[in-house]
Each structure stands twice: as C-alpha cells, then as structure tokens.
Amino acid sequence: MTPLFHLENIVRTYPDPASRDPHAVRTVLNLSELDIRAGKILGSRGHNGSGKSTLLRIIALLEPPDSGTVLFEGRPAGTDDLHLRRQVTLLLQTPYLLSRSVASNVAYGLRVRGIRNASELQNRIAASLLAVGLDPAVFLHRRRHELSGGECQRVALAARLALRPRVLLMDEPTASVDQQSAERIALAARHAADSGSAVVVVSHDHEWITPLSDRLVTLREGKLVE
C-alpha cells in the first residue's frame, strides 16, 4: 500500500552561527528514507537539535528540504500546495490559544475551512473535546486564563482533531503538561490513528512515546536510527 508521505534522501541545512564564514552551513537533517502511513503512529525521539522539529516542518510542508524527494500518495508535494497543506495539521509544544472561549478556539479552524452550519460546528467541537478528555458541559465556555497548561494543550489538540486531518503532527506535546493530560493526549493520538489519520509524534520522553508508537525511530545528529 502506498504510504501517505514518502521522504527520500532529505537534506536540510541552516546557516552555522558558530562559524565566521557567512556561507558556512550545518546539516540538521540527513534522512535516507521514511514512510508515514495512514492509521499508524510514528514516534520519533532524540535530543534537542537532533532534527526532530525540522522533520515535522518538512512533513507539514512549512519549509522545503535543500534536496530530496517528498511524495504524498505517490505525487510530489511542495510548500506551495495549499490544498495538501490543509490535510496536515501540526500541534506545537507551546499551545497558542485565542483569548476567547474554548468553543471559539476549537471552532476557529473550522470556520476558516468554510464550515458555518451551527449543528455541525457544535457536534465537531463537542466530539473533539471529548476525544481529549474535556467535558464540553464544563469547558465549552471557559476562557484561556481559566485553563491549566495541560488543559490549554488539550484544547489546542481538540482544535486540530476537529479538522479531521489526514496527517496529525505533534511536536513535544507533553513537554509542559501534567500526567493526566499526557495520558489523554496519548489516547487522543491513538483514536486519531484508529480513525485513519497518520500520526507523527516527536518527543524526548521515552517512557511516554514508546508504548504509544506503532513504529519508533531515533534521530541522532539528523540521521535516522531504528
């Protein structure tokens, strides 16, 4: 079966701030091959600077590699493909929420996508909050300042789940959350995969990411190690 994403011979470099040579670069990602499949959770671990976040940005089509091939369902994928970018969503380590109600935050992306039907909005908001373990009856009208850090991250994840993405990317999603939120985030990621999404999670938390992942890889100095 053709993977959703296929990455091959991916190289990404950035200017080297430690060098006096203005043309000097450092290689942050040197990836031979990686497949991302629907219905599976790919876990990636590694230390800071190992290339984990860069890998996610390339998969999210937010930045291109210097060289290499990125295919989506066998077709070339680039940062200018807005239709494809809408099928991929990225959850960051530090959630950004609007200073509005939880309902407004979850609905924001749906409205941007053109969903205006009140019943559909209500159903999607409620379902996504339940998926991250937040009772809509309790949290729907709460505002950002009334939420804990873990609850903010779960609302941010709910907003992405409401979009029903084909690819869900999560960058250190449990780095600043409590144990209960970490467990709920893991359950939500598994539910997304079981519903058909491809899920890619990067984390330095070995104990959290290992049981969650269908496949676990390690990035070391930009290179993939099983």
Tell me the role of every PLM-derived stretch:
Residues 45-47:
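The feature captures the beta-strand-to-loop junction immediately N-terminal to the Walker
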Residues 60:
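Helix-to-loop junction immediately C-terminal to a conserved catalytic motif
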Residues 68-78, 84, 134:
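Conserved ABC transporter NBD signature motif
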Residues 76-89, 112, 194:
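ABC ATPase NBD coupling module
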Residues 143-147, 151:
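Conserved ABC ATPase signature
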Residues 168-171:
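Catalytic Walker B motif of ABC-type/P-loop ATPase nucleotide-binding domains
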Residues 203-204:
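H-loop/switch region of ABC-family ATPase nucleotide-binding domains
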